[in-house]
């Protein structure tokens, strides 16, 4: 009945023309498809709060052709590429996706599959850890193990998706499409500009509102522009959370050593410089070292705020505790109803509301669900948005 159930792993921070191209390419590749997006919620993989909240992002995604939006919980969305990818692929697997389509700079799937297979060997893993221990970033370390094979940021994520598919023995079939013109950090000013460039415009404190909106108008679809315009003035960035981060570091200094991804000794720098700096930028630059990338430090700061520990990461690393549906279209609803008839439906842990949690989740899974809800509540402290509830339903 549903042959082409296609998964996307996205952040939509914010949704731009390149994302629309991704969706259109899926429609070109697969007729009569169901598109399921695993989407970072209120926090993204670079270790930052999402520019706009997850419910607004869900509205945009549904308006542009996505059929089901699944939240990628914070304990996956703010992690390294490996954990981010594995959690995402596991979620798509829970909803029986037949395919996954991702962007790639190289657009060479055979090459990426070969590298993914090699990268799962013990020899590769040992070499990778050696380079990481020397202070190289994950993408650079990965490249060095491959004798300086040049890989773009999207190629690295693509490799992690392929590795995850192999690791969990998923039947999902991978497709890649050419990443249109821009890389993760590109400042290209054509109609396929990157999310990084668009955020840079919107968060520029030296520009007037009208100028910012004019600059992005041709870079995002019309409905995305409308939502961004409505949310103008309440865009979230990490510096907004500095007082909360600082409070938590000072209050829980002795517990910081248990925080996910924290290097030994870094807890002392966090404590020392949080006491000495009133401004986030000064604090951040003092803590930053050559051994830590900007994104990694941002992730560590969020983990300290949430108290996201190594113990929590170990619990969710190999098995997703729940599947939270943020929204769906009429077609998406039909697919969800179809899944309800499957024999293993209860094992999928699908949540379409906060009701009946005790009937669906066990005690440990419920704790992890509540942890993710707490992270969103912290986001709402600074973003001034009201939780209107989920799922968001788009009638076709």
From Swiss-Prot:
Compartment annotation: Cytoplasm
Tree of life domain: Bacteria
Keywords recorded for this protein, A-Z: ATP-binding, Cytoplasm, Ligase, Nucleotide-binding, RNA-binding, tRNA processing, tRNA-binding
MF-aspect GO terms: ATP binding; ligase activity, forming carbon-nitrogen bonds; tRNA binding
One annotated GO biological process: tRNA modification
Enzymatic reactions: cytidine(34) in elongator tRNA(Met) + acetate + ATP = N(4)-acetylcytidine(34) in elongator tRNA(Met) + AMP + diphosphate
InterPro entries associated with the record: Rossmann-like_a/b/a_fold, tRNA(Met)_cyd_acetate_ligase
Entry binding sites for ATP: 9-22, 103, 154, 179
E.C. no: 6.3.4.-
GO CC annotations on file: cytoplasm
Membrane-spanning segments: none
Family of the protein in this entry: Belongs to the TmcAL family.
General function of this protein: Catalyzes the formation of N(4)-acetylcytidine (ac(4)C) at the wobble position of elongator tRNA(Met), using acetate and ATP as substrates. First activates an acetate ion to form acetyladenylate (Ac-AMP) and then transfers the acetyl group to tRNA to form ac(4)C34.
Name assigned to this protein: tRNA(Met) cytidine acetate ligase
UniProt source species: Fusobacterium nucleatum subsp. nucleatum (strain ATCC 25586 / DSM 15643 / BCRC 10681 / CIP 101130 / JCM 8532 / KCTC 2640 / LMG 13131 / VPI 4355)
Gene: tmcAL
